[in-house]
Amino acid sequence: MEISHILEDLVYDNGVLPREAIEAAIVKHNQITPYLLKILEEAIDHVSDIIDDDCYQGHLYAMYLLAQFRETRALPLIIKLFSFEQDIPHAIAGDVLTEDLSRILASVCDDVSLIQELIETPRVNPYVQAAAISSLVSLVGVKKLSRGAAIRYFGELLNYRLEKRPSFAWDSLVASICALYPKELFYPISKAFSAGLIDKSFISMEDVETIIHEESIDSCLQEVFSSTDLIDDTLEEMEKWLERFPFES
């Protein structure tokens, strides 16, 4: 299958999951990667067009494929694409934002500082910040980031790096700390709860205390190591989100 035909099938929604195009893209990994990166570059420049065109999906396939390829050149492009304010990230990515962006970021990450910058950028969508925070746990899970480094950074977010206004980013931060065992950060976590920054229906101080009493660093890390999965199969991932599309026969 020619590169041009692969891209045609990936870029627009024709009512079926483009299985043949995805499989061909994976086979032609090296040849198609520059084109996928170009799709992300163009998406950044034409976000309003993507929002207005319900059939366009090229940026989504590009992200998943580049994540499967572990293409680190995609990281700054994906970060830029999701740095738009307000609800634009959800408008261009839908449920991918809340369900898979963290895994995509972790899959292409070779520079944690870029993810940290995204987390700390003012006015970034809080669900994007949450995905970026969660991606650091995924990086611990695949042993590309140490627990110690992650906990130190999470402590900095609690104390001064993350804007102190209630948002899902704060909920994700506490949940991510708990995934790595929260005892060292008990005091700043309790301060965040006292300041009303955390949605207690998402995670409560009692939940934090229970983890401290019933778990350990080792048990939490074992769970993170065993449960973390990056993007390994674009077909499987896209099938999850495109259930309304029948497979090509």
UniProtKB/Swiss-Prot annotation:
Highest taxon listed in the record's lineage: Bacteria
InterPro entries noted in UniProt: DUF1186
Source taxonomy: Bacteria, Pseudomonadati, Chlamydiota, Chlamydiia, Chlamydiales
Source species: Chlamydia muridarum (strain MoPn / Nigg)
Protein's name according to its UniProt entry: Uncharacterized protein TC_0475
One Pfam family cited in the UniProt record for this chain: DUF1186
Family, as annotated: Belongs to the chlamydial CPn_0206/CT203/TC_0475 family.
